[in-house]
Regions:
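A short, exposed helix-loop element centered on a Lys and neighboring polar residues
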Residues: 1-6
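Structured, solvent-exposed acidic/aromatic patches
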Residues: 9-65, 71-167
Length: 167
């Protein structure tokens, strides 16, 4: 069986009226694409910075956020640019916007691997914290509005996301 892409719109006056009349414009579909890819690029940049600073906790968070955003894109569109697409976020020359579309089965396999890597990064962060070597293994509410720097809560969220992707 094939996976089915879906899109749900909340009830707003103008948009709902257009949908009820089957007057769906290109902008309705494009808003998901244009809204989420920059967020995935931000997560990729965060991942790059975490690796550069050897910050395993931040690396785990970045992997989870990247997977969360990309899973929403894949669920909405199916095959999408994935493996090469986010490299653009790290390039100084952003004129190259052409990339291949990757198979969603391969993307899902990679997202599972990313979430497993996130768990491994959190284990490393805890080991560093427990050993007394704390080279930025924690982060605070200043940069973590979701869980106030609580690695265990991020691990639970990542595991919940893993289960959602399995469905």
């Amino acid at each position: 069986s094939e996976l089915m892409q879906y899109s749900v719109n909340y009830n707003t006056e103008v948009t709902s009226q257009m949908n009820y009349n089957y007057s769906i414009t290109e902008s309705v579909d494009a808003s998901i694409w244009l809204g989420l890819y920059p967020q995935a690029g931000n997560a990729e940049y965060m991942l790059h910075q975490a690796e550069k600073e050897d910050n395993p906790a931040m690396k785990g968070v970045a992997l989870i956020l990247k997977t969360l955003v990309m899973s929403n894109i894949v669920d909405a569109y199916g095959n999408v640019p994935y493996f090469d697409a986010l490299k653009i976020a790290l390039q100084k020359d952003t004129l190259n916007y052409t990339t291949r579309y990757d198979d969603m089965k391969l993307i899902y396999a990679d997202m599972f691997a990313q979430l497993e890597d996130a768990n491994a990064a959190f284990v490393k962060a805890e080991e560093l914290k427990n050993s007394g070597e704390i080279p930025q293994t924690d982060f605070s509410a200043l940069c973590d509005y979701m869980y106030d720097g609580n690695v265990e809560k991020w691990r639970r969220f990542g595991n919940s996301l893993y289960l959602r992707l399995l469905m």
